[in-house]
A protein has these predicted regions:
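Long, terminal "pre-/pro-" and other extracytoplasmic accessory regions
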Residues: 1-177
Length: 177
């Protein structure tokens, strides 16, 4: 019986240690990607004077979204692709919809039960009229809709126009009371 008093805490310590190693490993990978994106942006975006924040987006392609300013102290948003398949996109924040404007639009027009997340991203979008594809900066909005489905709504960063929406079955994400 005394063996179990030593074995159980030892097993718990090993589990906690391994879980922390996995977590730290994944966070160091994300930090490494962020540092690569910052270095790439500093090298390729001449008007960039400072970087204030970095976020990660993973759609069809992964992007690191950098927030910064130029020499004129105008806010910049830089979409840095995490692979060679994507393309670098640089926009002034004033060229597109703000997060607050997106939030107001979604609440007014989609009437979500719960707004979960609003984040910038980029997707390759095909124009059916011209048959051309283009990497487009967009907003990804995640919310619970009126039918209690987990919903992703995508709209263009520049003008707020609808890109796509998809919802996951409600029984997969229903909260238990």
């Amino acid at each position: 019986m005394k063996k179990w008093l030593y074995i159980i805490p030892l097993i718990l310590i090993i589990i906690i240690w391994q879980a922390s190693q996995i977590y730290l490993g994944s966070m160091s990978y994300q930090k490494k990607e962020e540092n690569k994106a910052i270095a790439f942006a500093k090298e390729n975006v001449k008007e960039l004077s400072s970087i204030t924040d970095a976020k990660y987006y993973h759609g069809r392609l992964a992007y690191t979204i950098l927030y910064g300013t130029n020499e004129k102290d105008e806010e910049l948003i830089i979409w840095v692709p995490n692979s060679k398949k994507g393309r670098l996109i640089v926009k002034k924040a004033s060229e597109g919809w703000s997060k607050e404007k997106v939030k107001k639009y979604i609440i007014a027009n989609q009437n979500p039960l719960k707004l979960i997340d609003i984040r910038l991203g980029a997707e390759v979008i095909k124009d059916n009229r011209t048959n051309k594809t283009e990497t487009t900066p967009l907003w990804e909005i995640t919310y619970i809709d009126q039918e209690k489905r987990y919903t992703y709504y995508f709209m263009k960063f520049t003008d707020g126009s609808f890109v796509k929406r998809y919802s996951l079955k409600k029984d997969r994400f229903e909260e238990e009371n």
